[in-house]
């Protein structure tokens, strides 16, 4: 009941009189000889308008309105664009010594500043978390790949809400915020949750949440928080083009609504991460360009770097990796295959450069190019993950399988660079990407942690085309941009005090070539590989996958005399090494780096919280007419275990099409009806099998695939119709276990096809009849639940 104030010593009033007198108290009413009675006016808050700073009466005339002013950025605030590449080495763009045509990136450097000693966390998710938060990756729970939570604080995989992102900070300052492309900072890609981009400060997001996807057939694109309803991509579709097309569309939308509002655009290209796939027109530019081989191309890049002044005089080119054969020792047929891999890589980077040119042209046309801060960089260096021969079917690694023989890749050479393969280039080309440094992605040597870094702001940075040799790290990007844009750091985030930023602004270095580096030390850790940099010295410890961690195998390098980190000085300076090793240990404890984990890819990639693992025996029913069921839901139901999949449907005369499909070109299975009969194609990550089933009668039907996991990744299956013929057992090896991007489709095979030939005949091959449901019944795991690759 609402309480009403009454005057002191007032007579007792009946309810109606109380109401009358209360109303009267709100208006001038001389009583008692002209003196106003001591009534207390009820405030807006007491009437149910808490926090409203205006006044509310019973009528408009008695009230005072109030309008909240929207947050506006300061007048003249710059636009901010970050173009982030994926798995691109220090030496891959033209302005860092490459032969690849990157005129738009080179122009960015010509009107900006290049850094020669910028470093990163050497793997995807940690580098992105550090970039977006200005904090060390482990300290924001992202010391490893986001989708592989091992259960320790530095590795949970989701950026905590008390670590505000640059998007959240800029939006609070009045910026429009946009992200396109790759996210890879959420553990849960299935359901909308507070780790998705639009929950972490972005007004608009168009892209994918996971670590990689195909370029011709991306899996599960999100438009903000909604799965884009894409069954098939149009002819000529290519993801890198699509990301920029949407970015330009978002920017145009912003300008149509508000011509002056500054924007922050995060272009997170998945190029040049595998699978290496490129458009034919771009591939054609590079045919024959890499026939000279990786030794010659690497030497030429090194010479250009020296001539540019990026690499100091007297620097040694790091020795060739012992795992990389000399090019002239590679058989001629393999040379052609290996060159094709690098042609594809170059074409992909060329395409990304073209799209940067489209963005620059738009900003130039709008008259906003001069007042736009551009940052261009990569998450980490080039990768050696595919080994000396590369891999056409690299997804086998994610499925805990050994690579296929190079002879098979030779037979399928025409697939390299197309949507049919999931290729990654050979280690020799990764060493070219990382010229002049040794080491690769996931390792803390120079090749993994040192990447190109360009900052451009024509309106304010006068030293165009210059090179800065001051040390910098990825966590410095956010504070630098906030400093340049004069945007304050957030004190609170999602109702909590914000974690302090660990990055330092590089603004002084950008404005003055002689300014000291604001940062003089930094730790690095990835997959138990460690490094520590301090005042020109760096200690590095690299590990062998799956072996006991060696805590004493550190090497020591002096940056002033050894830019390429190719000379080990640990014996000459044992005290300096001990100092850096101790500093790493202190930083590791302070940033939640421990425990170190050096398990194999199979063990790490396939681990997850126990509550996400289905029971040993489980049954799931799935309904048609819905979006693709996420692979994280489907894969555990069939991973290296017995299972039965049953599709119930009504079949009419002449009906045909896909009943269900799991997976994509990388691996999976598709059950379909063609020429009146039940058929199955099984894509065992480059090993293909087919089962022919019985003819399908008209009427209500129930078709089943029965699968047995036999151990050592072998399996067999058979097709059956309820009440009808049961097919013969046929080999379906290897067992499926991750490695594909798509989940379960019912009634069609969306986007990337499991069976390429079937797709060429029929496209997505939508079933013409009526499907009731699909049931997956999981059985026991394989007898040994072994990993073929340890």
Residue ranges and their predicted role:
Residues 595-790:
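Extracellular glycan-associated modules
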Residues 22-550, 554, 563-582, 596, ...:
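Formylglycine-dependent sulfatase
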Residues 560-564, 724-726:
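Asp-box/BNR beta-propeller loop motif
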Residues 1-19, 28:
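Ser/Thr-rich, low-complexity intrinsically disordered segments
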Residues 581-599:
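Charge-dense polyanion-binding interfaces
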Residues 265, 453-455, 532, 555-557, ...:
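Short beta-strand motif preference
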Residues 17-18, 44, 57, 610, ...:
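Intrinsically disordered, low-complexity regions enriched in serine, threonine, proline
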